[in-house]
């Protein structure tokens, strides 16, 4: 029998110097979702999530603005959710507040990735 799991998605947070390289360290770069976010951002001439997370040095002027920090937090949370061992855990509920509400919608599969692109969810890119 699988353990039941309630996932609480993070609301506002920070992507600070200690988080730099998080996707590479914990998720081998982040997978398909990160690649899709990278392509989306590149299309707008914005630094990609992979570039931001893989930077040699943390730069407050680069990493802290909302258009970068919000998506870094979002990308890390999506990668964390995707890494849950579904053989061991059954996700029975997903919740969040503030930005975590958007994350919860994504993690729960309420809207698909492509559908989110036209909703304003990524307008901060």
Language-model segments: residues:
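Short capping loops/turns at secondary-structure boundaries
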Residues: 70, 96-97, 114-118
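Short, flexible micro-motifs
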Residues: 13-16, 103, 112
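Gly/Ala-rich beta-loop-alpha elbow adjacent to hydrolase catalytic centers
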Residues: 92-100, 104
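Alpha/beta catalytic cores of group-transfer enzymes, especially the acyltransferase/condensing modules
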Residues: 108-125
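Helix-rich "cap/lid" substructures immediately adjacent to catalytic or cofactor-binding pockets
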Residues: 2-95
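Stable alpha-helical structural segments in soluble proteins, enriched in small hydrophobic residues
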Residues: 79, 102-108
């Amino acid at each position: 029998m699988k353990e039941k799991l309630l996932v609480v998605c993070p609301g506002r947070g920070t992507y600070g110097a200690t988080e730099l390289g998080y996707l590479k360290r914990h998720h081998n770069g982040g997978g398909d979702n990160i690649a899709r976010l990278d392509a989306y951002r590149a299309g707008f001439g914005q630094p990609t999530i992979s570039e931001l997370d893989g930077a040699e040095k943390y730069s407050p002027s680069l990493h802290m603005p909302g258009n970068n920090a919000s998506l870094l937090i979002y990308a890390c949370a999506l990668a964390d959710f995707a890494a849950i061992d579904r053989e061991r855990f059954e996700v029975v509920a997903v919740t969040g507040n503030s930005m975590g509400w958007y994350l919860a919608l994504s993690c729960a599969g309420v809207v698909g990735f492509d559908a989110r692109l036209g909703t304003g969810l990524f307008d901060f890119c």
